[in-house]
């Protein structure tokens, strides 16, 4: 089991566990520099990120805002900016957390796009949804929500000349816990390689409120299961996923779930196949 843990961790470029606060600060500096270099390489000046109210988008948003603030100071170019985007589906049940995230990030600009009308309009036109069991239809529409959110972010980025930031990290990547070409689509993923507790450590060091740092993660895509916890979908806890990624002991059953899920979702982590 240890060898396959190492193989998967290497494939996902998992970062070593943090030993000290200096390790956390080094990762913050590294990821801010990464964001800045992506902007410089692209020739663009704007970053776009959807803010959900969860710790992942909060952390990525804090990194993004710091990145552009430093670029403005270093270069004297005031065109560098970060746009934080709220993308609720009708009324979001944890909207207060999303607003608290925005207040913490203090982005240069905030926009709101309610995806409810677009999702409903598309769902009404899809003959493929007719006759489906309610749970299956709800799942498919949940993925539509994620993809519409990414369409909106890329529309803003296209209009403003920017790059779209993703929030994927190693704990989600190993489980394939993202919508293909939805929240899995982005131009840069500054949280890549981090375990879930490491994302929380960065958020905490960046000044995020503890209630948002330790908030129970949920994709919240399905109407029939509002606020459904990620861990309930995984069948394992984030603590177990993190232990697996760092080559630490964990329940054999949990390790098997993670390995099986990793293989089943491999297609999500690959580019489209070609002849």
UniProtKB/Swiss-Prot annotation:
Catalytic activity: deamido-NAD(+) + NH4(+) + ATP = AMP + diphosphate + NAD(+) + H(+)
InterPro entries: NAD/GMP_synthase, NAD_synthase, NH(3)-dep_NAD(+)_synth, Rossmann-like_a/b/a_fold
Organism: Pseudomonas paraeruginosa (strain DSM 24068 / PA7) (Pseudomonas aeruginosa (strain PA7))
Protein residues bound to deamido-NAD(+): 147, 180, 187, 267-268
Subunit details: Homodimer.
One of the GO biological process terms: NAD biosynthetic process
Pathway entry: Cofactor biosynthesis; NAD(+) biosynthesis; NAD(+) from deamido-NAD(+) (ammonia route): step 1/1
One GO MF term attached to the UniProt entry: metal ion binding
Gene3D superfamilies named in the record: HUPs
Name this protein carries in UniProt: NH(3)-dependent NAD(+) synthetase
Binding annotation for Mg(2+): 56, 172
């Amino acid at each position: 089991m240890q060898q396959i843990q190492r193989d998967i961790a290497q494939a996902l470029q998992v970062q070593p566990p943090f030993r000290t606060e200096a390790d956390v600060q080094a990762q913050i500096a590294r990821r801010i520099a990464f964001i800045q270099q992506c902007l410089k390489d692209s020739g663009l000046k704007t970053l776009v990120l959807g803010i959900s109210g969860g710790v992942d988008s909060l952390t990525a948003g804090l990194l993004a805002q710091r990145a552009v603030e430093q670029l403005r100071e270093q270069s004297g170019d005031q065109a560098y900016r970060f746009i934080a985007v709220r993308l609720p589906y009708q009324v979001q049940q944890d909207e207060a957390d999303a607003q608290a995230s925005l207040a913490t990030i203090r982005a240069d600009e905030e926009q709101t796009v309610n995806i409810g009308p677009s999702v409903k309009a598309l769902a009404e036109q899809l003959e493929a949804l007719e006759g489906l069991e309610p749970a299956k239809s709800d799942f498919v529409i949940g993925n539509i929500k994620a993809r519409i959110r990414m369409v909106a972010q890329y529309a803003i980025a296209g209009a403003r000349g920017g790059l779209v930031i993703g929030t994927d990290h190693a704990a989600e990547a190993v489980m394939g816990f993202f919508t293909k070409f939805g929240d899995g689509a982005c131009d840069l993923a500054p949280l890549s390689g981090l375990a879930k507790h490491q994302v929380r450590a960065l958020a905490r060091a960046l000044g995020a409120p503890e209630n948002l740092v330790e908030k129970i993660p949920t994709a919240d895509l399905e109407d029939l299961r509002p606020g459904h916890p990620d861990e309930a979908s995984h069948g394992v806890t984030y603590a177990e996923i993190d232990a697996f990624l760092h080559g630490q002991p964990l329940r054999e059953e949990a390790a098997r779930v993670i390995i099986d899920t990793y293989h089943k979702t491999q297609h999500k982590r690959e580019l489209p196949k070609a002849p």
